[in-house]
Every structure is written in structure tokens, then in C-alpha cells.
Swiss-Prot record:
GO terms for molecular function: hydrolase activity. InterPro entries: Metallo-B-lactamas (IPR001279), RibonucZ/Hydroxyglut_hydro (IPR036866), UPF0173 (IPR022877), UPF0173_UPF0282_UlaG_hydrolase (IPR050114). The keyword Amino-acid biosynthesis does not apply. It comes from Bacillus cereus (strain AH187). This is UPF0173 metal-dependent hydrolase BCAH187_A4741. The keyword S-adenosyl-L-methionine does not apply. Keywords: Hydrolase. Belongs to the UPF0173 family.
Amino acid sequence: MKVSYHGHSVVKIETNGKVIVIDPFLTGNPKTDLKAEDVKVDAILLSHGHGDHVGDTVELAKKNNAVVVAPFELATFLSWQGVKTHPMHIGGSHEFDFGKVKFTQAFHGSSYIDEENKTITYTGMPAGILFTAEEKTVYHAGDTALFSDMKLIGELNNVDVAFLPIGDNFTMGPEDAVLAAKWVQAKTVVPMHYNTFPVIEQDPYQFVEKLQNCTGKVLEAGESITL
């Protein structure tokens, strides 16, 4: 399994001949190395409905005939835009032909904001994502605060790599993310959701230096690890 980071919260997984992308915020993302028109994908996994996570989902899904796996309300909202979806909810899991997906808790918000019409559409609860294939598990925490049930994620799952937000302001900051890493018990921890905007500027190298009992790895956009 090849796992690549592409800036902000964009993660690409290549496994068993399939390509899965999590939270494909590409257009307007100053930290990504990808262009939406160049991306080939079989499945898109979404943690929540904010624009910096849904990103180019509709375009990518339609162009590639890819299924979008998302929390129920967000999946329904996207299905109304002509996208093929598979709705799920927190605590539920499903075996797809590309791997197993399970949604976990996340403490954040989830909505579609229409700036032009000044409306906000509720898109369900935010989530973290556990993805398992080839006997390897990736945990993408989505946007979240620190919460004590991260201990359960670590106890119930053998997490090979965890992507944790460290940007602060909208999510947990580096200090809380260090504790999250301890609780999740991942073998490798990769920081995400930082330095995309001024308000979430952080030093990822300082973060990984504080990690204990795991390997911290800063991935630049386009870099990957093999599990």
C-alpha cells in the first residue's frame, strides 16, 4: 500500500490496483501538488462537508465515475448533484472492493456554505476515517479537537499510520495532537491541516520532535510512505 500526502488534509492511497483519495481539496489549495484535471481516482472518502475538504469531489467523481463515501447527510447532499455515493455513519463500517472503511467520531462542524446566497446547509456530523486494506490500517482524523475516545481507536485498531491535524484554531493544535498520537498508538504519525492559511501556521518539525513511542514523519506535498 502506498500512502501519499498532498497538502492540507489531502491523502491518496494506492492499493490493490485502486486509487482512493481522502478530502480532495485541490483547486484553491496553495499547498497541494495536484491538479484536479490530472487526478484519476476510484473512490473518494470525505470526513465532513466544509469546502476545504469536499473541494473538487463533484468534478472528480463525475469525471472518473468514482464512488463518494461520506457521512449520510453529506452523501445525500452530493447525490443531488449527480454524484454516485455510498452513505455511512459514525461507528459503521463497510467492505468495498478497494478496502474497508469505518467512520469514527470527530469533534468539529460540517456544513456547505454558499457565500453568494449567504446560506449554510447542514451536512451531518463530522468524522474521522479508518481505512484498511492489505492488512494495513490508515487513520485520517479529519478536522477534530482532541477527545478521550481516541484511546478506543488505539485499543480497537492496529493503526499503521495516522494523519492528525495540528493547525490549531479550527482543530487541535500541536500539543493536543501529541497526546492524540499517544492515544491512537499509530506506528507512524503524519501531521496535516497546517500552514495552508495564516491562521493555522505551525512548525510540523517541532511537533514530530515531541512524539513518543511512534515515528513522526513530515511529508511534503507529493511525498509518500509505503506500508
